Amino acid sequence: MASTPKIIVVGGGLAGLAATIKIAEAGGHVDLFSIVPVKRSHSVCAQGGINAAKNLKGEGDSTWQHFDDTVYGGDFLANQPPVKEMCEAAPGIIDLLDRMGVPFNRTPEGLLDFRRFGGTLYNRTAFAGATTGQQLLYALDEQVRRHEADGKVKKYEAW
């Protein structure tokens, strides 16, 4: 019987935690290394929010408009196929993060609230007050802890 390879993830910020979760969900075993305790990684400083064209305010936003804003905002220097993929994936990622427990701001009706941010033409930025990065980091760390309890992840912090 072949053993499952152990995968090393270096970095306990949002990208490292997301990679760790994805690998663990696929059945892999992960050693996660972070030079600081995960909840002190620099991702905690991200404040603005995450853009996704969910069009909950009925403004006519779309993934194509999101793509156009992103390419234009980057002075047309971005590699456009990955930008298109990112814009198409963004609404589903917001939904996933919401299900993971990120306390995004809500409208009085209980829907996700979106605002304009960073030069966007539409209200497409999902946010958690002024602590979006911290809330994302804490929610993803809780998911990693769940996989730690299952024995799929071993975390090495402050090494």
Walk through the language-model features, giving the residues of each:
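A short, basic/flexible loop-to-alpha-helix module at the beginning of a structural domain
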Residues: 1-5
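N-terminal Rossmann-like FAD-binding beta1-loop-alpha1 element of flavoenzymes
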Residues: 6-32
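Conserved N-terminal/central alpha/beta ligand/cofactor-binding core
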Residues: 35-159
